[in-house]
A protein has these predicted regions:
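Repeated loop/turn-to-beta-strand initiation elements of outer-membrane beta-barrel proteins
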Residues: 86-88, 182-186
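Residues that define the transmembrane beta-barrel architecture of outer-membrane proteins
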Residues: 39, 69-75, 113-119, 134, ...
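Membrane-embedded beta-strand positions of outer-membrane beta-barrel proteins
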Residues: 43-47, 98-100, 138-142, 172-174, ...
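Extracellular loop and loop/strand-boundary signature of outer-membrane beta-barrel proteins
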Residues: 61-65, 107-110, 156-162, 197-204
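Transmembrane beta-strands of outer-membrane beta-barrel pores
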Residues: 49-53, 81-83, 102-108, 142-150, ...
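Gram-negative (and chloroplast) outer-membrane scaffold detector with strong preference
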Residues: 86, 93-144
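Residue-level signature of outer-membrane beta-barrel architecture
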Residues: 81-83, 125-127, 176-178
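Short glycine/proline- and aromatic-enriched beta-strand/turn motifs that initiate or cap beta-hairpins
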Residues: 36-82, 215
Length: 215
């Protein structure tokens, strides 16, 4: 019996030792993988010029300016990170990147709409490689926009598209990514944008644009 107990204790210690060795190997490999796949951080600027879809009477001319609202413009500051090009993880995930952005918008009617600011998260990846330096990418974003001048029965009765000072921001688009150098690249493409409160507050016809972007 004592021999069996000693034998069991020795087996238990051996299993514990093997588990510790295996754990050390896993941690060592994880550290190496993390060191090899350290993230690349990027800071970018982007300008957009857009067309406003006339989905409401307010946008079609029933506003204080008595004119159709067709154009929008915005400026964006964006931070993103990704895995180094050429690594196994980068190839698996299609050169994906993610980050946060800050956008400033002007729709040509500051008195009735304001000049909202959007804070959003975004993610993108390569759709297809055209040349070693040129690729077709997609990008989408989701966040919140602040600083709208919403509908008010007395002070802002024409604005039937926004019923709140804070509204959701959604975007999706494609662009060409041209790698100019290891530190700089150029993006040119189109982005569809939607602002609304998601029918949680009325009126809420929302605002939709299609933008040309460069950055």
């Amino acid at each position: 019996t004592r021999f069996r107990e000693r034998h069991d204790i020795m087996n238990s210690k051996m299993r514990t030792g093997r588990a510790m060795i295996l754990l050390m190997i896993i941690l060592f490999l994880s550290d190496n993988i993390c060191a090899q796949d350290a993230y690349i951080h990027r800071l970018g600027m982007e300008g957009r010029a857009g067309y406003i879809f006339p989905t409401s009477s307010f946008l079609r001319g029933e506003n204080d300016m008595r004119k159709i609202m067709r154009s929008a413009c915005s400026a964006h500051l964006k931070y993103s990170f990704r895995l180094p090009p050429g690594t196994a993880a980068d190839r698996i995930y299609g050169s994906s990147y993610q980050g946060i952005g800050l956008g400033y918008f002007d729709f040509g009617n500051r008195r009735e709409m304001g000049t909202p600011v959007a804070l959003y998260a975004f993610q993108g990846a390569r759709i297809a490689g055209i040349t070693p330096r040129l690729s077709l990418n997609y990008e989408w974003g989701f966040g919140a926009s602040f600083g709208w001048k919403p509908y008010d029965y007395l002070s802002n009765p024409n604005n039937t598209i926004m019923g709140s000072k804070v509204n959701a921001y959604l975007s999706a688009g494609i662009h060409l990514n041209w790698i100019l150098s290891p530190r700089f690249d150029l993006n040119i493409g189109a982005t569809a944008v939607h602002f609304s409160k998601g029918n949680t507050r009325y009126p809420n016809t929302g605002l939709n644009t299609i933008d040309f972007k460069i950055g």
